[in-house]
Amino acid sequence: MSEEDPKACAEPEEPKAGPPPEKTSDWYRVSEDLPARFNNPAWFRGYRTKEPPSVYRTSNQAYGSRAPTVHEMPKVFYPNSYKFSRQVAVGGMFQNNTLNVYMEKSIVTGPDNYITSYDRLNFHPSYRVCRPSICD
């Protein structure tokens, strides 16, 4: 018992650090104003680790379950201008308050026929109980 167990006295080894995550700028020439999230694809989290049953797996699930790589990240960033949104916020969206008095034409019945409220049962020329309109 006077002899100490060498395993018990040894300090636990620290886990070795892996290689740093790849950056898009390591592989491609990127724009200077590229946001940091696009230069570091390893920052994206929340990708699926649990596999769903293969019977119900779709191609979108297969594509969306993988985290992006440096080859799929954008190299240039074009920020959107909010000029239109600021103008709409000041004046509001355009509102059309006119009354629609045009009788609507149906795509089903063709350009010659109009859908009317009083002709509910025979709105289509071929919709007849006794025989189709081809027999006329």
Curated annotation (Swiss-Prot):
GO terms for biological process: axoneme assembly; cellular response to UV-C; cilium movement; determination of left/right symmetry; DNA damage response; establishment of left/right asymmetry; flagellated sperm motility; regulation of gene expression. Microtubule inner protein involved in the attachment of outer dynein arms (ODAs) to dynein-decorated doublet microtubules (DMTs) in cilia axoneme, which is required for motile cilia beating. Functions at the initial step of left-right asymmetry specification of the visceral organs. The lineage of its organism: Eukaryota, Metazoa, Chordata, Craniata, Vertebrata. Microtubule inner protein component of sperm flagellar doublet microtubules. Interacts with CFAP53, ODAD1 and ODAD3; the interactions link the outer dynein arms docking complex (ODA-DC) to the internal microtubule inner proteins (MIP) in cilium axoneme. This is Piercer of microtubule wall 1 protein. Its main location: cytoplasm. The keyword Iron-sulfur does not apply. Keywords: Cell projection, Cilium, Cytoplasm, Cytoskeleton, Flagellum. Belongs to the PIERCE1 family. It comes from the Eukaryota. Disulfide bonds: none annotated. Expressed in trachea multiciliated cells. Residues 1-16 have a biased composition (Basic and acidic residues). It holds the Pfam family PIRC1_2. GO terms for cellular component: axonemal A tubule inner sheath; axonemal microtubule; cytoplasm; nucleus; sperm flagellum. It is found in: Cytoplasm, Cytoskeleton, Cilium axoneme; Cytoplasm, Cytoskeleton, Flagellum axoneme. Residues 1-27 are annotated as: Disordered.
